[in-house]
Amino acid sequence: MRPLMLQGHERSITQIKYNREGDLLFSCSKDQKPNVWYSLNGERLGTYDGHQGAVWCLDVDWESRKLITGAGDMTAKIWDVEYGTVIASIPTKSSVRTSNFSFSGNQAAYSTDKAMGQSCELFLIDVRNADSSLSEQEPTLRIPMTESKITSMLWGPLDETIITGHDNGNIAIWDIRKGQKVVDSGTDHSAGINDMQLSKDGTMFVTASRDTTAKLFDSESLMCLKTYKTERPVNSAAISPIMDHVVLGGGQDAMEVTTTSTKAGKFDSRFFHLIYEEEFARLKGHFGPINSLAFHPDGKSYASGGEDGFVRVQTFDSTYFENIFE
């Protein structure tokens, strides 16, 4: 089936995310304006206008009422999903690199970059009664990162922990009640982690790293379960909610890209078997590295956002579901 090509960004995509039901697809890019799309037909429903810098991250809450974004203009913003208005704008001392709502939707976490003389910090805020006064309130928790900066973040089970992926390849679990690190993965990855995404049941998550691999980890012990190897940096990876499949996307850094790379298959979405670690399919499409991937919650399609500024929504053919490993 022909993919849907969503063209609404002027610069490269930084992150895409589906809401829980999968009817909405959110995208953000370096062009300052996050977008929301109707995932079934690719219609753009609206933009969230207010940031003054590249938007690095976004997340939508469980009920699709609030959206949180973090940007290079040194703010994290909470938006009303339906009306597109800013509920709260939280100033920070450096760029906001990651942002996530907790599963309950009561809290949100975001992290700032190690830049301009500022250290990387992880912040927790209460968003139950979020309004403009949130910008003056102190965060409920603040954890300074003494080592490497956070490049990716997930909430752990029951909103009790936060899993962070770092620029040096480390993964750590933080107890948010104590504000302390409880598990450290060591150096399973030899280079920075670009993305982390949970499985549907939350028991494991997949990482995408600059060391050219994606790995599957246990969410509680951080034990490395599987490794998916490629030849170039992996920017994003996602786990199918219905099949034992993992999709990887990446490519070289934008500086190293040449126009011939497209022919060489360097910008494909690559499908691996979750358990056997074998690559079984590739899908072409983007003219440049893939920066973000997301499976639709029903597992029947997936979306990819690339350096070329396009979001592509690809619906799987029936043969995909019949693909049984011998």
UniProtKB/Swiss-Prot annotation:
It is found in: Cytoplasm. Pfam families: EIF3I (PF24805). It comes from the Eukaryota. GO terms for cellular component: eukaryotic 43S preinitiation complex; eukaryotic 48S preinitiation complex; eukaryotic translation initiation factor 3 complex, eIF3m. Keywords: Cytoplasm, Initiation factor, Protein biosynthesis, Repeat, WD repeat. InterPro entries: eIF3i, WD40/YVTN_repeat-like_dom_sf, WD40_repeat_CS, WD40_repeat_dom_sf, WD40_rpt. WD repeats lie at residues 8-47, 50-89, 145-184, 188-227, 285-326. Coiled coil: none annotated. GO terms for biological process: formation of cytoplasmic translation initiation complex. Its main location: cytoplasm. Gene3D superfamilies: YVTN repeat-like/Quinoprotein amine dehydrogenase. Disulfide bonds: none annotated. Component of the eukaryotic translation initiation factor 3 (eIF-3) complex. The eIF-3 complex interacts with pix. Belongs to the eIF-3 subunit I family. Component of the eukaryotic translation initiation factor 3 (eIF-3) complex, which is involved in protein synthesis of a specialized repertoire of mRNAs and, together with other initiation factors, stimulates binding of mRNA and methionyl-tRNAi to the 40S ribosome. The eIF-3 complex specifically targets and initiates translation of a subset of mRNAs involved in cell proliferation. HAMAP family: eIF3i. This is Eukaryotic translation initiation factor 3 subunit I. It comes from Drosophila simulans.
